[in-house]
Amino acid sequence: MDKLLIEGGVRLAGEAAISGAKNAALPILCAALLTREPVTLTNVPQLNDIDTLLNLLGQMGVKVSRDNAAVTLDASAIDNPVAPYEMVKTMRASILVLGPLVARCGEARVSLPGGCAIGARPVDQHIKGLQAMGAQVTVEHGYVHAVVSRLAGARLFTDMVTVTGTENLMMAACLADGETVIENAAREPEVVDLANCLVAMGARISGAGTDVIRIRGVDRLNGATHRIMPDRIETGTYLCAAAATGGEIRLTRTSTAYLDAVVDKLMDAGCDVVTERDAIRLKAPARLTSVNIRTSPYPAFPTDMQAQFMAINAVASGAAMIRETIFENRFMHAVELQRLGADIRIDGNTAVVQGVERLQGATVMATDLRASASLVIAGLVAEGETVIERIYHLDRGYERLEEKLAALGAHVRRIA
């Protein structure tokens, strides 16, 4: 199993290009199930999660062709509307085939999902919404089985803000009979990107980006070409890496448009951040000032950046309080950061981080995707060598990580 070896103490400098957003690409790939016509997507990142989903779609009968960052999907013949456990167990986003399959085929059988082990992320909101639209849904032997002749528009209220739930129900509603209204909808930019693609395919959607989304169903959707938005979490991760090392970098093919909460905190920490057209510059001070963090749904501070900010607070001046309000059990990286010398105390959903002068290299273990990123950042700052085990988590969400870090001057390589 591969590991990542980092020789710390190097100030990051230079330029790197940001990839397309994994969390936008995954639902948009699933949206291709809604039409018999080809859908072409560009700026698709080359990641393990993307490969897993493309393999799953292929098993269902979708013809997939890929040329680097361009993917064309032809779902004219779906002959197997099933997502088996073997394909689903490593990736929670596979639940996103449920809505499109039910809407298009009238039936779906999808294994309950896996993915990062960061607490309970139930699919009950997906099921409740499909039931309100007329589907008969059962959960047996680890599978969600949904059947309907045609979905009917309905007024849906999610008990909690759920990104994948909003996406699943929005896709399902595109082919429903009548109007569907999703209240308490997720407002994330990735939801908007999905809506933009669906509209290009002929869907009638309004309100994406607000907490009330309206979808008027149509009889059929068309093919389309769509460019996946830049990955705001990858962008934030590299900004944090530069900030932690006292570096100065320029990130291209990205924007601060969806990163206000992250950029504000980096500036509070002492960084200069300049937005250019399709690029961001960051210049960090010699040592950061600690910043308090509270995660909340978009447009507030994203939970997917919590671990990275724990890493930069670990070497900042002062003490910081980090509150995680989205997921339970999302402080598993704290123990690994402590192995590097970080001073962190956990009390329920709150972490108190007292910045230290320096971290020391050690062997640490990644526990989930964003936790892996925090360990990379800490390893870049630490004195000596840091070895990160179980980096398959990183391969799920960061395209060409070693190559991009090396372009910024980091001493990092993959080892067996």
From Swiss-Prot:
Residues involved in phosphoenolpyruvate binding: 22-23
Recorded coiled-coil stretches: none
Sites where the protein binds UDP-N-acetyl-alpha-D-glucosamine: 92, 121-125, 304, 326
A GO BP entry: cell wall organization
Highest taxon listed in the record's lineage: Bacteria
Gene Ontology molecular function terms on file: UDP-N-acetylglucosamine 1-carboxyvinyltransferase activity
Main location: cytoplasm
Enzyme Commission code: 2.5.1.7
Modified residues (2-(S-cysteinyl)pyruvic acid O-phosphothioketal): 116
Pathway it works in: Cell wall biogenesis; peptidoglycan biosynthesis
Catalytically driven reaction(s): phosphoenolpyruvate + UDP-N-acetyl-alpha-D-glucosamine = UDP-N-acetyl-3-O-(1-carboxyvinyl)-alpha-D-glucosamine + phosphate
Keyword Cell division: yes
Entry keyword set: Cell cycle, Cell division, Cell shape, Cell wall biogenesis/degradation, Cytoplasm, Peptidoglycan synthesis, Pyruvate, Transferase
Compartment list: Cytoplasm
HAMAP family linked: MurA
Family per similarity comment: Belongs to the EPSP synthase family. MurA subfamily.
Protein purpose: Cell wall formation. Adds enolpyruvyl to UDP-N-acetylglucosamine.
Official protein name in the record: UDP-N-acetylglucosamine 1-carboxyvinyltransferase
Organism, as annotated: Aromatoleum aromaticum (strain DSM 19018 / LMG 30748 / EbN1)
